[in-house]
Design a protein with these regions (language model features):
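Pre-Walker A segment
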Residues: 191-241
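Accessory nucleic-acid engagement/destabilization modules that flank
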Residues: 1-213
Length: 241
């Protein structure tokens, strides 16, 4: 379900008004019937300021689409931020951006899992790149509009408070960072360049509206993967917040 859906220009105006977190909060209540805690409101305020800084760039079209808090159908999960538009050849692109407030994290010996301080203490959670990639994999596997219309999903993660200390980009997590690039505190310009590379023109085809209206139906690729998994090959993707 779409919650916040506007153009880049409108998003920048919402941030400039110092009301973006209130606007998102009101839309979450209106469309999802859910009240929001203060910590989540604060995270919206902070993260959207950082995304504003990245997107204030004339090379990123003002009519590209911005979706915030997109609800994955039947998954009970949400995508923090999606930027949509067309590339140089006119192909539809949707950049999925997982946003984190983390300022520190530690590696674990588990596949795709890190530990960080959340709420009451240290918790094990999915690596942000794994998380972003899993959302794209879900849509690629189940959303008929995505796989029939050839919409290219580009997952990544932006940890705007986390220093580049090598923990999250270590070899242990290299496979997931390759699938969903990780941008850290000092990487705002790199994220901007990543967006520039893939979104050269505005969203002319209502990409997120089409995705949101897409029928949930397993793709042939997913069916083949499930068949492979039943034969003993590991192709299972864990979805988790």
């Amino acid at each position: 379900m779409l919650v916040y859906q506007k153009t880049k220009a409108e998003f920048l105006d919402d941030v400039l008004s110092n009301q973006v977190e209130v606007i998102i909060q009101d839309l979450v209540l209106k469309k999802l019937g859910r009240k929001t805690g203060q910590s989540e409101i604060n995270s919206w305020r902070n993260s959207m300021m950082y995304m504003n800084n990245v997107l204030v760039d004339t090379h990123i079209p003002s009519d590209s689409g911005v979706s915030i808090e997109y609800q994955l159908p039947y998954a009970g999960l949400r995508i923090d931020f999606v930027l949509t538009g067309q590339d140089e050849q006119g192909a539809d692109k949707a950049i999925i951006i997982e946003l984190k407030q983390w300022s520190e994290a530690a590696a674990t010996d588990k596949d795709g899992v890190v530990s960080t301080y959340l709420g009451k203490g240290l918790q094990e959670v999915n690596h942000p790149s794994y998380q972003a990639w899993s959302y794209a994999a879900y849509l690629n596997g189940f959303n008929e509009t995505v796989y029939t219309d050839g919409i290219k999903l580009l997952p990544c993660a932006y940890l705007h408070n986390h220093p580049d200390n090598g923990v999250l980009t270590s070899g242990h997590y290299a496979d997931y960072v390759a699938k969903a690039p990780l941008f850290l505190k000092s990487d705002a310009l790199k994220l901007r360049e990543f967006i520039r590379q893939h979104v050269r023109h505005g969203d002319k085809s209502g990409i997120m509206y089409r995705i949101d209206g897409g029928r949930i139906r397993p793709s042939k690729q997913l069916a083949d993967s499930l068949a492979s998994m039943m034969k003993g090959n590991q192709e299972f993707i864990l979805l988790d917040e």
